[in-house]
């Protein structure tokens, strides 16, 4: 389970990452853009994306995926004080991604770009505490998926 300071840091940083739907779409596009740029091999998991989507994530399907991911992350942040719910969400996330052939190692690649994502998405307003809290949450999700 996450510590109280980590939970607070997640909630605080979430306001910067997902203030509204437009911000959530922008955050999703940025996160996946960083993933695809850093790890082009991850594109194999997104068979329904075309070159334009991979280039900018600024297509209907790209925006929809980014929004879905950030809606899911929002569920974790919103329920972060309820360990049973967080664990249930982690198991659901794992089931959904296992069915698509996405491994814990694939999640680790996303985790690897997350600090850069936080810097870029927040205009460098993400603190070390924010970064550590997201790293702890992602580590927990990876563990649930292993």
Swiss-Prot record:
The modification N-acetylalanine is found at residue 1. Heme b binds at residues 65, 97. Gene3D superfamilies: Globins. CDD domains: Mb-like. InterPro entries: Erythrocruorin, Globin, Globin-like_sf, Globin/Proto, Mb-like_M. GO terms for cellular component: extracellular region; hemoglobin complex. One of its GO terms (molecular function) is oxygen binding. Keywords: Acetylation, Heme, Iron, Metal-binding, Muscle protein, Oxygen transport, Transport. Residues 1-146 form the Globin domain. Signal peptide: none annotated. Belongs to the globin family. Homodimer. This is Globin. It comes from Buccinum undatum.
């Amino acid at each position: 389970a996450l510590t109280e300071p980590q939970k607070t840091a997640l909630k605080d940083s979430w306001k910067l990452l997902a203030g509204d739907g437009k911000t959530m779409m922008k955050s999703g596009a940025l996160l996946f853009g960083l993933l695809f740029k850093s790890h082009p091999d991850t594109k194999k998991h997104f068979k329904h994306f075309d070159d334009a989507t991979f280039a900018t994530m600024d297509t209907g399907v790209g925006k929809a995926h980014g929004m879905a991911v950030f809606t899911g992350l929002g569920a974790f942040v919103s329920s972060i004080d309820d360990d049973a719910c967080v664990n249930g969400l982690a198991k659901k996330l794992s089931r959904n991604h296992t069915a698509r052939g996405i491994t814990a190692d694939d999640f680790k690649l996303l985790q690897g770009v997350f600090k850069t994502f936080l810097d870029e998405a927040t205009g460098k307003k993400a603190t070390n505490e924010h970064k550590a809290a997201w790293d702890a949450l992602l580590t927990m999700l990876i563990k649930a998926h292993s």
